[in-house]
Each structure stands twice: as C-alpha cells, then as structure tokens.
Amino acid sequence: KTSASEMLGKVELRYNRQDFSDFNNKVVFDVQFDKASIASNDLNYFYNEFGKDNVFYVDTHLVGTLNNFTTHNLRLVDKNQSEIIGTINFKNLFGKGNQTFYMNGNFDRLTSSYERLNKILPRILGKNLPSALDKLGTVNIVGGVELTQKYINADIYLISKLGELESNLSMQNIDYIDNALYKGTLILNDFDLGTLLGKKDIGRATVDLDVDGRGFTQKLLNTAIKGDIHKFYYNGYNYQKITVDGSMKMPYYKGYFNSNDPNLKMDFDGIIDLSLKAKNYDFKAQIDYADLYILNFVKNDSISIFKGN
C-alpha cells in the first residue's frame, strides 16, 4: 500500500539465488490481484511510460518475469472509464539494448476512445494509433492485437458511433502511423465514411475489401483496393452491388469497377483526377443503363436515361 495505491492479493517469487544477477529476465512473479487500485504515478517509478494522474482498478492473475509476463483473465478499469477484459502478454517493458517492447492481447472486450487510450500510454499508444480513430468516439473492440514499436497485427471486430468494422490487417512502419504500410481485409457494416473522411457528399457504406497500401489521411492515402461494395451512399443516392479493383493515390483513382445497381449498370476502366474543381476523366466505360435523374446527376427527368460507350 502507498499513499495512492492499494493492493489485496498474493505475491510469490520463484527463483534460484543466481537469478538475482538478471532479475528482470530470470525471477518469476506469480501475483494474484484480488482487488487493486494502482496509481499510474506509482507505476512510473518502475516503467516511465504511463500517463500521469491515472488510476487503474485491476483484477488479474499475473505470471512471468518483469520482461515477459502475462496478465491472465484481466479485468481493468481506469478512472477515465476505459475498460479492458482479456489476456495480455507483455515483453521487454524493462528491456535493454535489442530487447524491444512487445504486446500480444486477446481481448474479450476493450472499451475506450482514441483520447483515453492516449492517456494510458501516451508515447506508445499515442504514436501508434492513427489520428483518424479520434472520429470514432468510444469504441468496443473484440479480438487480437499484436503490437511493437514497428508493427501492428490486428484481427478485430469494432463497434463505434460511426458503425461496425471488422479487420484483419498487418501494419508496418508505424513510427509515422498516419503513413503506415498496411495489408489485409477490411469489412465495414453501415459505416459512416463521410464523417471519417470529412466528405459531406459521402454517407454510410457496407463493403468487403482487400487492401494493400499506405496512409490513413486524404493527403497520404495510396492503396490498392479489391472487393465488393454492397452499399455506398454518394450524392444523395445509395449505390448497391458494385465490384472494384483499382488503386487510390490522392487525388487520383485508377482502376476498374462494375456496377449492377438497378439504376446504374456499367463497366468502367480508367483514371479520375479529383484535384481540380472541374474534374478530369480518362476512361473507357460500357453503360448498359444509367438513370442520371435518380442518381442526382441531372435535374430534368425527361433526359435522364443514358446508355452507350
């Protein structure tokens, strides 16, 4: 017990006498936290990466050395109402030389926000979470996350105020997270892309895509996308049944898409330059049917039906 922290539980240390010469890597802790409130300011005496003036309320069974331990059946709530339930392995919290930080978490539930996560580990999480996540608000996450100072592997299901997201992504070069490399699958369900991207003419989307590229902001985005767009709200119309295979490097989109929407049946292959007020297009398209009035491209429904190349 300290002036700011209190722990009720059992602590056992397992070691041979010679292990004390390499205490952080050899002495095994077996700690049962039955009830504990631990101040981040106290933790910073041992590992100076926690945000200041936070308090963690913890129930877990911790086993391992200081440089390789696992919190089994962890239940953690902090004073900012972040909640973590799951099992997490930490390595090299006290590493030296080539011993770099590593975390592998299997989360039954993680409830927090971009701002609140930054307050837990400002330098580790603050640098490794894309700034766009701030627009999601409070999120609930289930799944697995592997995190180092160089890469993140995330196989998660996420619910936020913008909608639902499933991802199985590998991200590298996360030193500059907004321009990180990524590859994997991304599924959005009724997700408000317009708010995330800051585009008023874009609304909610339901998509199932393979992605391979870099960048999480409009300026840095450069990615290949391939898959199905089941629903996409644009310019006042909900598009359906679209297949895409192309790349986006702002301000250019280059590639193919096929639309089997009831009001837009077409094949498109080409380039769109979105950098100018008067958009530039260079493409080939076979349009079997397009109702430009329903799609909100013309205001006079008497000339709205278009077919051709």
Where on the chain are the PLM-derived regions?
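Interface amphipathic segments
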Residues: 1-309
